[in-house]
C-alpha cells in the first residue's frame, strides 16, 4: 500500500486514529518530558493516553499499543516503540512500528490513520531516512484504511 504524504500537524488531520512515536515504555512516563508528537498529544490531549500506555509495561522494539485519545477528537492513539534503549531509531524499529501499527488498524477495522515520520525526532534519524524506511514498510502491508504520512510543518 502507498500512503498519502501530507504536510502539516498530525493533530490537525481528519482521521479516526493517530500514531504516536513513543519509546519502549521502560522509563516511567511521568519522568519523561515528551517532545514532538508526544509533547503535542500531552499538551492538547492530556495525560490519560500516557497513563494507559504505561499500564502495558515494556513494549518490544517496534511494538504497538492502542489507547484512548484523551481529550483529542480521535477514536484512539496507537503508540509505537520507534526508538531503542539508547533513544535511537533503527531500520527494524521503524519498519516494525509501521507494520505493527497497521496490524492494529486492520484488526480494529479503523478506516483512516495518520502517521508521523517515526524516528526523525527523538530517534535521531533524518526525516528522509525515516520516511524511506516507512515507505518500504508500507509496501509490505495490505489494508483498506486510508493512510497519511504527515511531514510536520507548522501552519500559521
Please place each PLM-identified region on the residue numbering.
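N-terminal short beta-loop-beta anion/metal-coordinating cradle
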Residues: 49-74
Amino acid at each position: 500500500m502507498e500512503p498519502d504524504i501530507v504536510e502539516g500537524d498530525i493533530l490537525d488531520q481528519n482521521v479516526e486514529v493517530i500514531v504516536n512515536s513513543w519509546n519502549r515504555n521502560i522509563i516511567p512516563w511521568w519522568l519523561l518530558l515528551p517532545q514532538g508528537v508526544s509533547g503535542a498529544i500531552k499538551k492538547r490531549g492530556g495525560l490519560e493516553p500516557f497513563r494507559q500506555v504505561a499500564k502495558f509495561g515494556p513494549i518490544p522494539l517496534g511494538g504497538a499499543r492502542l489507547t484512548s485519545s484523551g481529550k483529542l477528537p480521535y477514536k484512539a492513539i496507537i503508540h509505537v516503540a520507534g526508538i531503542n534503549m539508547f533513544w535511537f531509531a533503527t531500520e527494524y524499529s521503524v519498519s516494525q512500528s509501521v507494520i505493527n501499527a497497521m496490524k492494529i488498524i486492520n484488526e480494529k477495522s479503523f478506516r483512516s490513520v495518520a502517521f508521523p515520520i517515526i524516528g526523525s525526532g527523538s530517534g535521531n534519524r533524518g526525516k528522509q531516512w525515516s520516511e524511506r524506511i516507512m515507505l518500504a514498510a508500507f509496501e509490505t502491508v495490505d489494508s483498506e484504511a486510508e493512510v497519511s504520512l504527515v511531514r510536520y510543518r507548522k501552519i500559521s
